[in-house]
UniProtKB/Swiss-Prot annotation:
Gene: speA1
Cofactor(s), by name: Mg(2+); pyridoxal 5'-phosphate
Function: Catalyzes the biosynthesis of agmatine from arginine.
GO molecular function annotation: arginine decarboxylase activity; metal ion binding
Binding-site list for substrate: 332-342
UniProt xrefs under InterPro entries: Ala_racemase/Decarboxylase_C, Arg_decarb_HB, Arg_decarbox_C, Arg_decrbxlase, De-COase2_CS, De-COase2_N, De-COase2_pyr-phos_BS, Orn/DAP/Arg_de-COase
EC class name: lyase
Annotated keywords: Decarboxylase, Lyase, Magnesium, Metal-binding, Polyamine biosynthesis, Pyridoxal phosphate, Spermidine biosynthesis
Protein name: Biosynthetic arginine decarboxylase 1
Natural source organism: Synechocystis sp. (strain ATCC 27184 / PCC 6803 / Kazusa)
SUPFAM superfamilies given in the database record: Alanine racemase C-terminal domain-like (SSF50621), PLP-binding barrel (SSF51419)
Enzyme Commission code(s) on record: 4.1.1.19
N6-(pyridoxal phosphate)lysine found at: 141
Amino acid sequence: MEGQSIELELSVMAMPELIDSTEAGHTAGVKTDSNPQAIAQDRRWTIDDSENLYRITGWGEPYFSINAAGHVTVSPQADHGGALDLYELVKGLRQRNIGLPLLLRFSDILADRINRLNAAFARGIARYRYPNTYRGVYPIKCNQHRHIVESLVRYGTPYNFGLEAGSKPELMIALAMLQPQENPEPDQQNQPLLICNGYKDREYIETALLARRLGHRPIIVVEQVAEVALAIEISSNLGIKPILGVRAKLSTQGMGRWGISTGDRAKFGLTIPEMLTAIEQLRRADMLDSLQLLHFHIGSQISSISVIKEAMTEASQIFVQLAKLGANMRYLDVGGGLGVDYDGSKTNFYASKNYNIQNYVNDVISAVQDACVAAEVPCPVLISESGRAIASHQSVLIFDVVATNDINPPLPKVKGKDHAILRNLMETWETITVDNYQEAYHDVEQFKTEAISLFNFGYLGLKERAKAEELYWACCRKILQICRQQEYVPDDLENLEVNLASIYYANMSVFQSAPDSWAIDQLFPIMPIHRLDEEPTQRGILADITCDSDGKIDQFIDLRDVKSVLELHPLIEVHQPGTPPRVEPYYLGMFLVGAYQEIMGNLHNLFGDINVVHIQMNPKGYQIEHLVRGDTIAEVLGYVQYDPEDLLENMRRYCEQAMEDKRMSLEEAQLLLENYERSLLQYTYLKPTSGIHTS
């Protein structure tokens, strides 16, 4: 549902700040106190404090950092090029009338991810003297958008990097995006591979086989036993010999949310008995030499290297046993699973990983080589489908805060003649200390319950209930300030931080731009992209602008943990004589969102695709490669079968009737129709306003 694609070549002034950063290793993180309250009161907040708080060094290396101005920077070429100030970049894009929310895609990061993966395999092959090569493929399902796939194919060309298709539509993309060889040799290895996964019908297999005539090298991976007979039949009819693979259901159990990708009840693949059945079918058809690849997948985002080691040991043994049964085994596709360190802890926490790319590669190579050497079987070409590790870092979601809601009411005055429950609450507030704060919390909880009961039975008026609630929250806030200074917080007070958190209303839809955050509680790094030289004194959660209580983010990264609030800055009000107060823009970034999020987003509340800007570095700074405008309201209405012209005509008719009945003036009708027609052509998200702050 992308909007119209507009390509721009706009060079702007460079900001050549160099960031010397390298890919993080796999050493375990050390717990440090990231609580802003722990910062000594007699010293100023620094960007080092922000780096520690938001853990940007952990999850952001080597691409993201903070500069001296307190702004997040991105180094798309890692340690080989300059850095861009994200805050200044967003300001420049807004001056070009590119509204928020927007997605920034950095194609140079894609290039760097491919370079790093291939370099790691090259080092591993050299270290172990592995007697074959590596041929990576990008699984299109991670992000199918055209500019992404085009960039990946372009940057992968020096490495003969191929594509993986998991469906018929993705096969159509792969066939048209990969450049076929003009005069391919039957056993040519130095060309991109096209791995054909997923469930297949006759047309899928026919198309894949005919692609060999074009000069492609498709490998049809059998996911179900029934596909073997179909492939044999179609191959015979077309007179084209296929390259076949089988996907194995490993007994090695994955981990995390995708652990069910393996095992006897996994959705995809063949069990060992089914593999033997497939081999016999191919043997009877005199096509056993067509079986050349073993594929497995133990799930996305594998956090522990031990799981990878176990899977590689099992898969390597299956590979050599297939070869001993007479299959012409030449390829081993280890699938996906190469993780992304979303929280920067470098541990086996589900939002992290306790290994780096080189660790992963070394374990893949050594396991395969050990098994093949022991069995005297030729070592295969190694294939991986590391989509998440390739695509995640290149996309950054930027959105603004349109309003906040704080629980910080003024302390009401309580007089001697007021109800006893109010006097009790005020007395509690006055006497809260570090020695009795837990007891005081229990007291105010009881008083609040009593106040509600008194109100429900008519013994307390509405104004008195309001006073009771204000006093209750004042007591809770005073208790929370004490809790923040303690090394240990009692269990019954742990929810205070959440209960008193501000709500920051974000101009975005979680369902459209971060669906995994809503659907599976995926953690993404989120932080302000500016004001990082200031202490973030607020604690908040994020609520999107959909009319859905699930449209919120209330889980944030911590060190091998999840925290329920995010440290944020108060909105800044600007007062000018003769004009309403204006709130300065406050921009937040959600990072590492380049895999799966865009394509899985939905139209909840009819919030459509957002603006996408492709940025590429050049000697002068950067240029906008592509601008893909987000959906307009008219476009989104069209997706759900409304004709905007019909809607506008209905509105004209209603206005005419209202004027005829003297319920509306001509000026009012014109204003309504102008607003309606103009709105149809506008972005589905909110325009910048003066901002709203409520307490």
